[in-house]
Amino acid sequence: MTPTLVRQTPTSHAGTAPPPEPGARARDWSEIQERMLVPLYEAAYDRLDVGLGTRLLGLSCGSGLALLMAASRGAAISGIEPRSPQRLALARERLTPDHWSPHARGNTYLGSTLPPAREPYTLITAFDATALLDIDAVRLAERGAPVVLAGWGPPERCATSAVLRLADPLNGGWRPAHRDDLEEIAHRAGLKPDGSGRVACPFGYAGADSAVRGLLSTGLFDAAVEASGQDQVDKEIREALHPYVQPGGTVWMPNVFRYLIARVP
């Protein structure tokens, strides 16, 4: 995830089949793909004891699932999603007061830019670690506050890497994680590493159709679609998924993600 499954690069597309419109892609992200990272969110929140008293800012918050999980623990949440207005709209819909903890209702901000000045945040999450380089958010956290950065684990422990290699890394696509990616991003952001962990995040889908939709929703294949066409990219993804199709037709790909906790000096 450095670049990650949540990186989205708008492009034009070529090919015989038109690509899904952005709203459909965002819904596929929200309904299929985003939940694959729930174990990562839970591990980070458990380690940092997220709950009442936590003031959390989520960077590149997608359609808001990680924020919803923090709010259900009692955290006051804010999130920014500058890359996808469609995902941001879904986050706003998902994070209505009826859906989550009443403790956080009065403190919620969801937008495409940083929130207005308010009480410093006690936690910043960048489950797409590259978001920390795009957004000057560290200044909004209190001194000593943890910042969570996350990314893919070793390629040999991530079955999905066999599929993601079809994406073009030179055009916003995926590349294998390097050992010190997260530490390098933390250093560039002026943060001090203070612990790390690994989490199993298997990608499980009801079938190949669901898997293709979920993977395409990441935006990582946009350049490939532009170059080769939607039909060809769909075909190649299905071929790459074949070893992971189970007897009942479901798709199961074991993966490991890594997270780093860094501190605001």
Give residue spans per PLM region.
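Class I SAM-dependent methyltransferase SAM/SAH-binding core
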Residues: 55-115
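Local beta-strand N-terminus motif with an aromatic residue
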Residues: 53, 120-121
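Conserved class I S-adenosyl-L-methionine
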Residues: 2-54, 84-100
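A generic alpha-to-beta junction signature in SAM-dependent methyltransferases
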Residues: 48-50, 71, 140-143, 245
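Conserved Class I S-adenosyl-L-methionine
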Residues: 2-9, 37, 63-65, 185-265
